[in-house]
Amino acid sequence: EFQAMGELEYYVIAPDTGMFEATDQRGYHESGPYAKFNEFRTQCMSYISQTGGQIKYGHSEVGNFTLEGYIYEQNEIEFLPVPVEQAADQLMIAKWVIRNLGFKYGYNVTFAPKITAGKAGSGLHVHMRIMQDGKNQMLKDGILSETARKAIAGMMELAPSITAFGNTNPTSYFRLVPHQEAPTNVCWGDRNRSVLVRVPLGWAAKKDMCTLANPLETESYFDTTQKQTVEMRSPDGSADLYQLLAGLAVACRHGFEIENALELAEKTYVNVNIHQKENEDKLKVLAQLPDSCVASADCLEQQRAIFEQYNVFSSAMIDGIIRKLRNYEDKTLRADLDGKQQEM
C-alpha cells in the first residue's frame, strides 16, 4: 500500500499592529506574542480533525515579515501518513477549512508559492512510505531498504515532469531557487534540506528516547521504524493535489520497473549542501528542475507515456495540463525579472 501525507504551508496576512514584531525570516516554531496566528492555526486544526483529517502537529514557519503596513506570517500544518487517496482528500479539505476561517476572521490567507523575493515561499512537501501487511517497507536492518531506494530512483527519473502537477503557475519557479528553503536540482540525501527528495530523521535506533530523558517513564516498545518516510520537496500550494499524488505514485512504481533503479539512486545521492561554494562541482553534474511552466510542460511531454501507462492519466488530461502550462508563456520570465523585486 502506498501511503502519503502533506506538510501544508500558507501565509496569514493581516494589518500590522506594531506590537511584538517577529524577527524577519526567523519565524520557525515561534511562540506568541511574536507569532500572531497560533490560535487561528489551532482552530483550523480542530475543524480539520473533525472532518477526518489526521494531523501530526502545526507550527509557525520560517517566513515572517512586514510589508507596507501588513504582517505576513507563514504557518504549517503537518499530517500523518494515510492511504494516498485519503491524503489528497484531507489536504483538499484542509485548504477549504483554512480559507473559510480566514474569511470569517478577516484574514487574507494564501497558499501562493512565492509572495516576494528574498522571503521563504510556501511549499507542499509530501512524505511517502510503502506498507505491506501493516509493516513499513522503507527500512531493513536499520538502513534505507532496497524498496525505498527503488522508489526514490523513480522519483529521480520523473522529477522534472512531476513539476507539471506540483508547480503549476509561474510564481512556483521563483520559489525553486537556492537558499530559499526549496530544491533546485534532481538529487536526494539523508536529513539534507538542499536536496529534492530528503530522507528525514532515521528511526533505526533501538532506544526509547522518552525514557532516556524521563527515567521514571515506563519504556515503550513501539516499533519506531514504522515512522520512516521519504519527502518530496518540490511541490507547492499551486499543486493539483490529486494529480500530484497520482504522479508520485506513478514515479515510485516506475522505480520498480526500470532495470537500473539502484544505480540511479546511487548516482543521484548527495550528502552535502549542494548550494555551498565548496560543493559547486557536485552541483554541476546534477540535473536541474524546470525553471518555468513552459519548461515543465516540455518535460511532461517527453515523459507522458509513463504517466499514461495503465491508464492512470488519460492522454486528454495530459494534453490539457501541457496546454495550460504553455499558455503562461513564461519561458524567460525568471531571467527577465532577476533583480527586479518591484516588478515581481
Language model region names:
Residues 1-344:
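Glycine-rich, acidic/polar active-site loops that bind/position phosphate-bearing ligands
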